[in-house]
Amino acid sequence: MFHRLLNKSKILACDDKSVNDYIINVKNLSFFYSKKKVIDNISFRVKFGEIITILGPNGGGKTTLIRILVGIYKNYVGLVEYAKDFTIGYLPQHFSVNSLIPMTVEYFLNSSYTNRKRKLGVGDVLKDVNIEKILDRQMSEISYGELQLVLLARCLMLNPDLIILDEPVSCMDINAKNSFYKLINKLISIYNLSVIMTSHDLHFVMSNSYRVICINKSVYCEGSPSEIVKNEKFLKMFSSYA
């Protein structure tokens, strides 16, 4: 699964002051695999229009947290509150294309949703994501960076309020990473989006995030990039950052 359409009003929606002006409010969240605790008492909020990056080591709970937020994992302990009537688009870290099934990029996008779910057509998002030139190519032949753009376009067809991306630039070169982050900033303005990303790219994170949350099972520190780089817990977790 590489996206998820969620109408959170059907799961949990609150009107009280605790979620006023916030799209997601997480309180005292914990999660266990069997008897092993992998998320430990995490709390944070996401405001409308923010770019939030979640940093942490491998095995620190980033992907588990993301899967809770998008509704894949439900047997958690704690509270996750959502604003009413909003849609989440989700891109996981890994997505594979079956090379034995011929499918052009254009066909893939057009066949992605029923008319009921689709809020925008392929033509509405092509120019914004800059994939017009690869519509006739096979999905199995495009590069990783191009695949991420196609999946992002597919996500935007839902006209989501929030997009969640798990390590979206992990296999891109420096130029591609820079272009992708610039695109995300542009899309926030065009589509009035909020964004949550996980990442290991500290330097790109610091220049492309409104807020950074560092986790290793629990939240170690949280704040703006300028605040985070001075935080002793951040410096201890990422001792190689300079």
Curated annotation (Swiss-Prot):
Q: Which cysteines are joined by disulfide bonds?
A: none
Question: Which residue numbers delimit the ABC transporter domain?
Answer: 24-241
Has UniProt tagged this entry with the keyword Translocase? Answer: yes
| Localization of this protein | Cell inner membrane
User: Which superkingdom is the protein from?
Assistant: Bacteria
Broad class of the protein's primary localization: membrane
Fetch the PROSITE patterns from UniProt. ABC_TRANSPORTER_1, ABC_TRANSPORTER_2, ZNUC
Zinc is among the record's keywords: yes
Class in the EC hierarchy, top level: translocase
What is this entry's stated membrane topology?
Peripheral membrane protein
Signal peptide range equals: none
Task: One GO cellular component term, please give it.
Answer: plasma membrane
Known EC number: 7.2.2.20
GO MF annotation terms? ABC-type zinc transporter activity; ATP binding; ATP hydrolysis activity
Reaction(s) this enzyme catalyzes, per UniProt: Zn(2+)(out) + ATP(in) + H2O(in) = Zn(2+)(in) + ADP(in) + phosphate(in) + H(+)(in)
Q: Name one Pfam family in it.
A: ABC_tran
Q: What does this protein do?
A: Part of the ABC transporter complex ZnuABC involved in zinc import. Responsible for energy coupling to the transport system.
What family classification does the UniProt entry report for this protein?
Belongs to the ABC transporter superfamily. Zinc importer (TC 3.A.1.15.5) family.
Q: How does it assemble?
A: The complex is composed of two ATP-binding proteins (ZnuC), two transmembrane proteins (ZnuB) and a solute-binding protein (ZnuA).
Q: What is this protein called?
A: Zinc import ATP-binding protein ZnuC
Source organism per entry reads Ehrlichia canis (strain Jake)
The gene name reads: znuC
